[in-house]
Amino acid sequence: MSSIVVVGTQWGDEGKGKITDFLAEQSDVIARFSGGNNAGHTIQFGGETYKLHLVPSGIFYKDKLAVIGNGVVVDPVALLKELDGLNERGIPTSNLRISNRAQVILPYHLAQDEYEERLRGDNKIGTTKKGIGPAYVDKVQRIGIRMADLLEKETFERLLKSNIEYKQAYFKGMFNETCPSFDDIFEEYYAAGQRLKEFVTDTSKILDDAFVADEKVLFEGAQGVMLDIDHGTYPFVTSSNPIAGNVTVGTGVGPTFVSKVIGVCKAYTSRVGDGPFPTELFDEDGHHIREVGREYGTTTGRPRRVGWFDSVVLRHSRRVSGITDLSINSIDVLTGLDTVKICTAYELDGKEITEYPANLDQLKRCKPIFEELPGWTEDVTSVRTLEELPENARKYLERISELCNVQISIFSVGPDREQTNLLKELW
């Protein structure tokens, strides 16, 4: 029995899809456990680039199962568009499995997301407007429609009519807007469900069978720890728990099945949307990182905010997600900078702190305390071992590992699959 969880340690976009794809080659099952199509994974190999949102990164290995767990919220229409796009490019998707307990995103969730963000005005949280939050709200309110319900025509019809009646009153009272009608939704989404029917099953049983058979299971996280609804920069967070602990809830396996947790980070920091970002850069170094690193959101296309590496953030992520190994991506992006910086602590009201504050107002007052290290100019994109890295780049990574108290097991020097390097066996 062996399993690895891949989680983002920052605010998402760390390169989890790339690392999951890299590790998937030695896995038997790859499973997503949280989020929805608000996530964006970019995978590059064989001269081709693929952008995924809902489909697990393991889909590219046709002999392995790619599982969407019960903790994921699924927009059936968006999922079919993604699958059709892969099929058109010659990627088979018959190895996909979808939990029959996964919640369904419907048009009224997208409308609600839009209206609620508009109502917030200056207090907007930067939602992707994919209906993720409203779908999770319906789940907790126990009015959500699950994949198992979508497949049964009478069940779906009954639940949809009831929900639209409720949403109509809510939309009118809160936003003075109308809810998408039953006729706007039913036929299209029932048909989408029927197209997905062959993939829908009890994925918890699939995972349990894999463990019993001593197969290797890889759990693929979405977003990042700092977007976690409990442990992130609340309220500027996602609506689920991207931390490793949610694997058990989001896939239906026990905690004893988790063997290792790989925390994925960039050699710097990035963030999309609003919210605190203590090490954010607004100067030429920031411009360099954004352009060289192609820092634009996979899902939204928005320019990402960028900043120096923050060890306060990563120590927090290591603790709340139980990270055993670190994967550092995008080392090549920092090439050419005279000086690179690592945030080692914050100054809050004249005092040095080393842990991430829970209070948002305190966080806004935090000033990063930096340690400066010399940069490097050598091309690193073909490097395959730590020893081959320029001395300054190697010392930079070693200092990150030391500050965060976690070993580096993977490092990446470019976007392609072949530019990802394994320092130790993980399975």
Swiss-Prot record:
Active site residues of this protein: D13 (proton acceptor), H41 (proton donor)
EC number: 6.3.4.4
GO terms under biological process: 'de novo' AMP biosynthetic process; IMP metabolic process
Top-level class of the enzyme under EC nomenclature: ligase
Record InterPro entries: Adenylosuccin_syn_GTP-bd, Adenylosuccin_syn_Lys_AS, Adenylosuccinate_synth_dom1, Adenylosuccinate_synth_dom2, Adenylosuccinate_synth_dom3, Adenylosuccinate_synthetase, P-loop_NTPase
Keywords, alphabetical: Cytoplasm, GTP-binding, Ligase, Magnesium, Metal-binding, Nucleotide-binding, Purine biosynthesis
Binding-site positions, substrate: T298, T299, T300, G301, R302, P303, R304
A GO term, aspect molecular function: magnesium ion binding
Cofactor note: Binds 1 Mg(2+) ion per subunit.
Subcellular compartments: Cytoplasm
Binding site for Mg(2+): D13, G40
Annotated residues for binding of GTP: 12-18, 40-42, 304, 330-332, 412-414
Domain of life: Bacteria
Residue spans crossing the bilayer: none
Gene Ontology terms: cellular component: cytoplasm
The keyword Transport is annotated on this UniProt entry: no
Cofactor(s) needed: Mg(2+)
Associated pathway: Purine metabolism; AMP biosynthesis via de novo pathway; AMP from IMP: step 1/2
Chief location bin: cytoplasm
Catalytic activity: IMP + L-aspartate + GTP = N(6)-(1,2-dicarboxyethyl)-AMP + GDP + phosphate + 2 H(+)
Binding positions for IMP per the UniProt entry: D13, E14, G15, K16, N38, A39, G40, H41, T128, R142, Q223, T238, R302
Self-association state and partner proteins as the record states: Homodimer.
Family of this protein: Belongs to the adenylosuccinate synthetase family.
Function: Plays an important role in the de novo pathway of purine nucleotide biosynthesis. Catalyzes the first committed step in the biosynthesis of AMP from IMP.
Protein name in the entry: Adenylosuccinate synthetase
Organism ancestry: Bacteria, Bacillati, Bacillota, Bacilli, Bacillales
